[in-house]
């Protein structure tokens, strides 16, 4: 892995180390954290936590959470531990494969599991090994879903962000095991097709599916400066660390 650099998140509230090149978490991780309906005192596991951006953004927003992360790549797991320590966040970071979880995780149950599974299927090359592992799946999306559901307590919540063209695959994986599905499309600009979606499902839930209006990230027709271009809602999430109220509780 190339030398890491520190990036500010939530308006500088967090200072998190990530590789200078290759896979780096950004707005998607912050959006994932904002959508998780966790409450103080609950237990949260992130699958594929990388350097811990989503997990620690969630921990910064909701006090008193019991945080755990699972990361395949040792270098990223090491950065997550460093980030937790330097930002004063208590978290247990485990290095291992979600298909064969470490025994310490297999013995636990969580109120929430969050994940940003690889966006691309296997077979597409990436120039950087770390980026390739993070962005291109070696474990099928359905296995991510099953692994997350196994770690949830009954009635627990699974929160996932994924590309919109894999939404059908994700919903099929949830069928029969989780319900009360809520889908929040994420569009770059008003009137544009959504490129991402956050999907939240409850283990054992029976409520009907809900499709929400898109969350729009940018105001202007073309991209200029992030700080000026973000919608008010996106500013509140990305810069101020606010949550996204999806009406789940």
Give short role names for the model-derived ranges.
Residues 193-249:
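SAM/dcSAM-binding transferase cores
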Residues 21, 140-194:
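Conserved Class I SAM-dependent methyltransferase catalytic core
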């Amino acid at each position: 892995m190339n030398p890491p650099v520190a990036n500010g998140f939530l308006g500088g509230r967090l200072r998190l180390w990530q590789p200078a090149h290759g896979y780096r978490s950004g707005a998607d991780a912050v959006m994932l954290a904002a959508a998780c309906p966790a409450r103080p005192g609950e237990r949260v596991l992130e699958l594929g936590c990388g350097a811990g951006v989503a997990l620690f953004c969630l921990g910064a927003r909701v006090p008193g959470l019991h945080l755990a992360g699972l990361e395949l790549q040792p270098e990223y797991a090491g950065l997550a531990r460093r980030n937790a320590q330097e930002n004063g966040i208590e978290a247990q970071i485990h290095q291992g494969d979600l298909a064969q979880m470490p025994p310490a995780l297999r013995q636990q149950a969580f109120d929430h599991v969050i994940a940003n599974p690889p966006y691309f299927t296997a077979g597409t090359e990436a120039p950087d090994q770390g980026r390739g592992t993070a962005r291109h799946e070696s474990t099928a999306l359905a296995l991510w879903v099953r692994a997350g559901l196994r770690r949830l307590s009954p009635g627990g919540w699974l929160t996932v962000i994924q590309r919109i063209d894999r939404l059908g695959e994700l919903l099929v994986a949830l069928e029969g095991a989780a319900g009360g599905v809520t889908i929040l499309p994420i569009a770059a600009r008003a009137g544009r097709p959504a490129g991402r979606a956050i999907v939240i499902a409850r283990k054992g839930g029976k409520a009907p599916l809900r499709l929400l209006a898109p969350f729009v990230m940018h105001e202007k027709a073309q991209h200029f400066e992030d700080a000026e271009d973000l919608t008010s809602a996106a500013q509140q999430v990305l810069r101020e660390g606010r949550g996204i109220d999806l009406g789940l509780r």
